[in-house]
Regions:
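Extracytoplasmic beta-strand/coil segments of soluble accessory domains associated
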Residues: 36, 70-110, 134
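Short acidic/polar hinge/loop motifs at secondary-structure boundaries
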Residues: 106-136, 187
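Gram-negative outer-membrane beta-barrel transporters
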Residues: 167, 377, 418, 422-425, ...
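Transmembrane beta-barrel wall of Gram-negative outer-membrane proteins
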Residues: 177-208, 212, 216-263, 298-310, ...
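Flexible loop and strand-edge segments within Gram-negative outer membrane beta-barrel domains
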Residues: 226-230, 246-309, 325-335, 340-343, ...
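Membrane-embedded beta-barrel scaffold of Gram-negative outer-membrane proteins
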Residues: 168, 305-334, 338, 490, ...
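C-terminal beta-signal and adjacent terminal beta-strands/loops
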Residues: 505, 653-669, 693-745
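A beta-strand signature from Gram-negative outer-membrane beta-barrel systems
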Residues: 122-167, 744
Length: 745
């Protein structure tokens, strides 16, 4: 990686020099940004939070490079895990915990049975900006233990008459293989007449197969699903009416579906032995017909909102919504041990695949008012009902029984401005009242399977041990008061320091827990494993936004006494373990306008360290692995935006990581390394992307290149998870070109 580090050092030097140049003469006040995900009309600089907003221009640029909102956010955010470039985003975390994905504040995550498809629920063509709130918080309810990724859809048209946007894109791998070609078309039409407005749009995208930096097809994960070799459609509509000069009614609906074409099957790779001089051979793909239905994800949502920015002198926001998702997991060619049941078919002959089905009905209300131009107070109430199940669709069995989740949550926030805004004190509380209802059910037959040995060590064993266990259902209730508080000190405009404490609330992946029970006599009402995860986040930060300079530094530490980890079992299926978790990290960011007008340099860095209690003695003693935390990262960028021309070149360095702990120490002490834990270490890699766009007057023409230098690498997830699975050694995507044309009218 020496060459990449030299390249990085040179760009760092450019950025540092730029901060001392004549561009300082252009210093001015930073624009106030309101983050709707924070549930307040106050600007972001009034809140003791670390927030980022990815605007439409930057978002479109990143999507042109990588293809999705999730990839765009992960690329721009150093403390976000590198994406797996798959449909399922299991193990992709923000600050070492799962973020809450939302669209206009509507939660997309399904914590009862987390299928990790929440990053693909709307096409980026319809997203106006992405709001990121870092760290555990309960501002949007359950699920925000790692932060919030809120996708705000396109707004109402501002000018009378008809307007809109058209997008055409084509993509190709480095060698322009026929099966690697892809394309996208999108259209959006808006109409405004007086107080009424309407927006309607649709997109269609066909993705070809991916090729790695060695011109080999990237392997397929048939079960979890792929973005390659897929088709995506999204229909979007928005109707609005201004009831009063300050009051507005909006109805927003979306239907998103991504479905695999099912044209390929996986070819196993080769995981080299520990300390082998040979490079791992990644999983690949050949043409074939996998069994069952291809992996797919479908999300349908509709929301009705009423907002009034001057209702009795305050800001009123209300929303009711319905969200329904159906996530199909593909079938493997080899029969899966988990699905075997001799009562249905002989062992090792039974094929099956699963499907998550979830629907949510919810409402949100908040009212905010400023008193005496100093105290801004907010009161609100959220309600959510979620029903989720995971079915085996080939044999019509229940893997995860239909589970009902109900949450009622009143909350209050206050923000006090002192000394003419030099100091702000903020704080609040949210009371979460949760009920989880699960009916009586029986686990799959394979949960009680015991392999026969010679001599026998268990009776019964083999086929006679299949059968599963009966589990008594229940309706346990949980409630918790979640607190937050902080202080903001802004001695000069654009320079501020802050410190804060916040608590986040979520439920563990109950589906993974309930489907894994293997001993009789379990009662849901008394089972502690389904108790909520309460995490806290403490952080201190400094920000400077003056003139050409935009810099920040944040240190945070987070803990949960009974957190959740994803741990692979003997069959390679990830189960949930409830253990104490502690995470801390440092985030640095520097963006500066260079002396050349329109030219900017940027640097971002994140260092994260996470530990968990592996032996339940109350002390964190082992590192979180790649399924639960991201690697340290350095982001570098150089961008130009002036007149009709805009361009960017960006470089991401993912640093190597060794995972230590009690199990690793025991393995290192054994010269045979029976656990091969070193195979879970991360070797690191560096990637470069570029994009250029020119506005011709009749639309903009863009050319984007992902992985500019065609780097071959094994992705972070594959390098650190399932070291013994030769079907899970996935290489990252090689050099990929995307040519686009977009036109606004």
């Amino acid at each position: 990686m020496r060459g990449e580090l030299k390249w990085a050092a040179s760009l760092v030097a450019v950025a540092v020099v730029s901060t001392t140049g004549p561009a300082w003469a252009e210093a001015g006040a930073a624009e106030d940004i309101v983050v709707t995900a924070a549930r307040t009309a106050l600007p972001a600089n009034a809140l003791p939070l670390t927030v980022d907003v990815v605007g439409k221009r930057a978002l479109d640029q990143q999507i042109a490079i990588s293809g999705s909102v999730t990839d765009a956010v992960a690329t721009l955010t150093p403390s976000f895990s590198p994406t797996r470039q798959k449909l399922t985003g299991a193990g992709e975390t923000l600050r070492g915990r799962s973020p809450l994905y939302a669209i206009n504040g509507i939660p997309q995550s399904t914590p009862l049975r987390d299928g990790s498809r929440d990053g693909f629920t709307i096409d980026g063509f319809f997203v106006d900006r992405v709001e990121l709130i870092y760290g555990s918080n309960a501002l949007q309810g359950i699920g925000g233990t790692g932060g919030i990724v809120n996708q705000v859809t396109v707004g109402a048209p501002e000018k009378e008459g008809v307007s809109g946007r058209v997008l055409l894109q084509g993509s190709a791998d480095n060698s322009f293989h026929d099966d690697g070609l892809g394309g996208k078309v999108g259209g959006l039409v808006q109409y405004k007449a007086g107080d009424f407005d309407a927006t309607i749009g649709a997109t269609f995208e066909k993705r070809g197969v991916f090729y790695d930096g060695q011109d080999r097809r990237v392997g397929l994960n048939l079960t979890q699903g792929e973005t390659q070799d897929s088709r995506t459609t999204n229909f979007f509509a928005r109707l609005g009416y201004a009831i009063t000069p300050t009051g507005r009614l909006d109805l927003i609906a979306s239907r998103f579906e991504m479905k695999g074409d099912g044209d390929y099957v996986a070819v196993p790779g080769i995981r080299r032995p520990w300390r082998s001089p040979l490079q791992d051979m990644p999983t690949s793909a050949i043409r074939g017909n996998p069994p069952g239905q291809p992996a797919a994800s479908r999300t349908e949502s509709i929301a009705l909102s009423y907002t009034d920015s001057d209702l009795w002198g305050g800001n009123f926001v209300s929303q009711i919504f319905f969200n329904r998702s159906r996530d199909t997991f593909g079938g493997e060619i080899a029969t899966q041990a988990t699905f075997q049941d001799p009562a249905i078919a002989p062992v090792n002959t039974l094929f099956d695949q699963s499907q998550n089905r979830s629907r949510k009905l919810g409402a949100k209300f908040s009212y905010e008012r400023t008193i005496l131009n100093a105290l801004t107070a907010t009161i609100g109430f959220d309600a959510l009902a979620d029903k989720t199940e995971q079915a085996l669709i080939a044999t019509n069995r229940a893997w995860v029984p239909p589970s009902d989740f109900r949450s009622l949550a009143p909350f209050a926030q206050a923000n006090l401005k002192l000394f003419d805004g030099m100091v702000r004190l903020a704080g609040g509380a949210r009371w979460e009242n949760v009920r989880i209802r699960i009916p009586d059910y029986r686990t799959l037959a394979s949960t009680t399977f015991v392999a026969c040995t010679t001599p026998p060590t268990a009776t019964p064993c083999g086929a006679a041990s299949y059968g599963g266990v009966a589990v008594a259902g229940g309706a346990p209730k949980f409630d918790d008061l979640l607190l937050n508080g902080g202080i903001v000190f802004e001695p000069w405009d654009g320079i501020r320091a802050y410190a804060s404490y916040a608590e986040g609330f979520t439920v563990p992946d109950i589906g993974r827990i309930t489907r894994a029970f293997s001993r009789p006599g379990i009662d849901i009402d008394s089972n502690l494993e389904i108790a909520p995860v309460i995490s806290n986040n403490r952080e201190i930060g400094v920000e400077i936004k003056r003139g050409p300079l935009d810099a920040s530094a944040t240190y945070f530490w987070s803990s949960s006494k009974n957190g959740q980890l994803l741990i692979a079992n003997a069959l390679g299926v990830f189960d949930v373990q409830r253990q104490k978790v502690a995470i801390e990290g440092l985030e640095l960011s520097l963006r500066a306008q260079l002396p050349i007008q329109g030219l900017r340099a940027g640097i971002g860095y994140a260092h994260l360290k996470g530990r968990f209690d592996s032996n339940n003695d109350g002390v964190v003693d082992s590192d979180l692995d790649g399924a639960n935390i991201s690697p340290d990262r350095l982001n570098l960028s150089l961008s130009y935006d002036r007149g009709p021309l805009s361009a960017i070149i960006q470089h991401q360095i993912y640093f190597s990581r060794r995972f230590d702990g009690l199990a690793r120490a025991a393995d290192d002490a054994n010269p045979l390394h029976p656990q091969r834990l070193s195979n879970n270490d991360f070797g690191g890699y560096a990637l470069t992307d570029a994009s250029i766009r020119y506005d011709t007057g009749f639309g903009g023409v863009s050319l984007s290149v992902q992985n500019l230098f065609d780097k071959f690498y094994i992705d972070y997830s594959s390098d650190t998870r399932l070291p013994a699975d030769n079907f899970a050694i996935f290489a990252g995507r090689g050099r990929t070109f995307t040519l686009g044309w977009d036109y606004r009218f």
